[in-house]
């Protein structure tokens, strides 16, 4: 029981921190949205572009957890060094706090996807949040499927080739989506972006 107490405290503090951060983000968003109230809702502002980039951290960390950790050690030393100094600490934190992904998922869904969202509707942010959630779910499904394969296959040449292909699929789709968000344009990923469009149209 004494050993479980620190873990419980850490979980409670983590949950409280996430709720506090989401509240602060909501207040900032409301304040900024208020300053843009005279703009057309379909105008893509700098806030929309920056806000559309943030949700893609969720599928990126999920993809690095599922595929990156297995194949990146085989990449050139310089690539691994850059990874260790930039993304690896975030991936370690993400892996050691598995409930974090679920909490962030529901926060994004509650704030941006629901019809009765408590914040003003921004179509560009909503599209990218929904797309990032879909990419996260696809990454989770692909990762679970890959881990379910026999370890002999996963460690074989064909298994590593499959893992490498899935890793680059994750990296390319997220990079493309982020670039389009910076440009203020809607991403057009085959099937995925179409599914997001259909979901948004059905909610209108």
Curated annotation (Swiss-Prot):
InterPro entries: Tic20. It is found in: Plastid, Chloroplast membrane. It is a multi-pass membrane protein. The keyword Plastid applies. It holds the Pfam family TIC20. The keyword Metal-binding does not apply. GO terms for cellular component: chloroplast membrane. Its main location: plastid. The chain crosses the membrane at residues 5-25, 87-107, 133-153, 159-179. Keywords: Chloroplast, Membrane, Plastid, Transmembrane, Transmembrane helix. PANTHER family: PROTEIN TIC 20-II, CHLOROPLASTIC. Belongs to the Tic20 family. This is Tic20 family protein Ycf60. The gene is ycf60.
